[in-house]
């Protein structure tokens, strides 16, 4: 997958300043960055704990922001083919999540 990079991005607290299950204001700077990223031929995965109607609402909210995804809560088909399985963990180059932390930051 050298021809493009993959970002998996969270919804609540990352793309959308929300109080689950309500929808809130967009993180406009991040959304603009991700639209540009995808316009350059890279891939985006929406990676969220939302399911059912809450997930449908989040996807519609993203479309209203002109933000489209190559996959939602799933690996890209080419990744599944490359590895021969569909791991529960999303395979990507970068994870963007308001609850993420680098290993060095946990103080071990």
Q: What are the residue ranges of the model-derived segments?
A:
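HAD-like aspartate-dependent phosphatase fold
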Residues: 1-108
């Amino acid at each position: 997958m050298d021809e493009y990079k993959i970002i998996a991005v969270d919804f609540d607290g990352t793309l959308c300043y929300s109080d689950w299950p309500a929808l809130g204001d967009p993180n406009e700077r991040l959304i603009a960055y991700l639209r540009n990223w995808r316009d350059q031929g890279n891939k985006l995965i929406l990676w969220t704990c939302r399911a059912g109607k809450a997930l449908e609402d989040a996807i519609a909210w993203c479309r209203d922001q002109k933000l489209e995804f190559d996959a939602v809560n799933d690996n890209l088909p080419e990744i599944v083919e490359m590895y021969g399985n569909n791991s529960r963990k999303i395979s990507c180059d970068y994870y963007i999540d308001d609850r993420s932390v680098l290993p060095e930051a946990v103080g071990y």
